[in-house]
């Protein structure tokens, strides 16, 4: 296994703000969750190696990425994986992930823009801007958005939001904050 500093020596020389803006070993940047130590970097390198089928490939194909996501129990369509790749590439390419892009995807934290985007569908239903919607609205929102969530998954989300049994409401601000915390800990 190669050392993390050897992955791409010119990454830190690239312009700031680019997906590859930070060096791999011990980098710290506003878009990342924090310093990435050698152990975490080695684990990510191993994960990348596994996803490339143990080959010394420079890219995880979109098909292998789709298979890996499905093997984790996430039911996404090929188009959703392609959308993810477009976001990561920041253009229309959907051909797969190179290691620096994989690192960005696996270590990027949730920022305020992402949190605002998560709030947007709820705010459409919450005309009074109270921060809560009914459990019925919550369930309908997920069904209408095309999410294939089970009743148990919706219940887990409602528990994260600390729903009130008496009031039959979901505090979506609490839910979004809890999800952001959980995602940033991953």
Swiss-Prot record:
The lineage of its organism: Eukaryota, Discoba, Euglenozoa, Kinetoplastea, Metakinetoplastina. Ca(2+) 2 binds at residues 126, 130. Ca(2+) 1 binds at residue 98. GO terms for molecular function: calcium ion binding. Gene3D superfamilies: EF-hand. Residues 41-76, 77-112, 113-148, 149-186 form the EF-hand domain. Residues 1-23 are annotated as: Disordered. GO terms for cellular component: myosin II complex. This is EF-hand protein 5. It comes from Leishmania tarentolae. This protein has four EF-hand homolog domains, two of which may be functional calcium-binding sites. Keywords: Calcium, Metal-binding, Repeat.
